[in-house]
A protein has these predicted regions:
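Cysteine-dependent hydrolase recognition
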Residues: 1-298
Length: 298
């Protein structure tokens, strides 16, 4: 098999305790080359649910994507990209990640006519440090986006600043316009928590996300930047030629990358990001342990 989907929360399918910190990790269900192996042989994800009411929305959203039964699929060309608030790190790390995405991929040449971009400090119509940023992002998601990426600070219940938290999910109105969310930040997929952000946003019935990618423990600015952009020097304006392959490159793979570097499913996105951390000499074992897919890995 190429994929495994765990169905249930930790009470139904226990997770492993990480070797590199106090976090849960499903990694070791999928490594088969001895105790020191940290590279999964099977792509994996989790439908975290304690009951059928939490499970059924995840199945229904996934089937809509699998069968392509969207009433209006045009929303898939909408994206939200957020460099969250951190006065010290966001101008280079956060803005660099988002700038790399828009310069190379999330642009008109790739069918994204008007990406909803929130840079820190300056450079976008609404910056992430403005008071209206949170409500604007929630409105974007409610109107329908296919993909959302946030990089900055989080906690177990969601994005910190601009805020997008568990308590905001009930107010969303994106029925039949579900998104994939990638949260490069601390703890949004801490699925041993009562209900982390990643669990809540995919469990939501008739709204929220079809899948959420995030970490079950704290993340780090260097590694999260490399995870998205690729190995190389940290810059506010990185270029393809100056970096290795990160998740954006492997997802779009339109620069002549070999087929072996095409990573397009949710669990493959995680895999490509972790490979970038490995290539950069970052804290690889920790990252292979903490990044998870809440949703269908395939």
């Amino acid at each position: 098999p190429s994929y495994v989907l765990f169905v249930g929360d930790v009470a139904q399918i226990p997770s492993f305790s990480g070797n590199t910190g106090s976090h849960v990790s499903d990694l070791y269900y999928c490594t088969y080359d001895g105790a020191s192996d940290i590279y999964p042989d099977i792509y994996y994800g989790r439908f975290s649910a304690n009951n059928t009411a939490q499970l059924i929305p995840q199945i229904e959203k996934t089937l809509m994507f699998e069968e392509y039964t969207f009433p209006d699929p045009s929303y898939l060309d909408e994206v939200v990209l957020v460099a969250g608030v951190d006065a010290s790190m966001a101008p280079t790390y956060g803005n660099g990640q988002i700038n790399y995405g828009t310069d190379n991929y999330f642009n008109n040449a790739h069918g994204f006519a008007s990406p909803h971009v929130y840079l820190y400090g300056s450079g976008s119509p609404i910056t992430s440090d403005q008071s209206i940023a949170s409500s604007s992002i929630l409105n974007d998601v409610s109107e329908g986006v296919g993909f959302a990426n946030y990089t900055a600070h989080c906690f177990e219940q969601g994005w910190a600043d601009p805020a997008f938290e568990n308590s905001d999910i009930s107010g969303l109105s994106n029925t039949d316009k579900y998104c994939v969310i990638v949260s490069n930040c601390c703890l949004p997929n801490a699925f041993d928590n009562q209900a982390c952000f990643g669990e809540a946003v995919v469990r939501a019935n008739g709204k929220g996300a079809v899948g959420h990618i995030g970490a079950s423990n704290n993340t780090y600015w260097n590694e999260d930047y490399w995870w998205a952009v690729g190995s190389g020097s940290i810059s506010a304006n990185p270029t393809y030629s100056q970096t290795g392959l990160g998740i954006f490159d492997c997802l779009f793979h339109d620069n002549g990358e070999p087929v072996s570097d095409w990573f397009t499913t949710l669990s493959q996105i995680v895999h490509s990001g972790n490979l970038a951390v490995t290539a950069a000499g970052g804290d690889e074992e920790y990252y292979w342990e903490i990044y998870h897919v809440m949703g269908d890995p395939s």
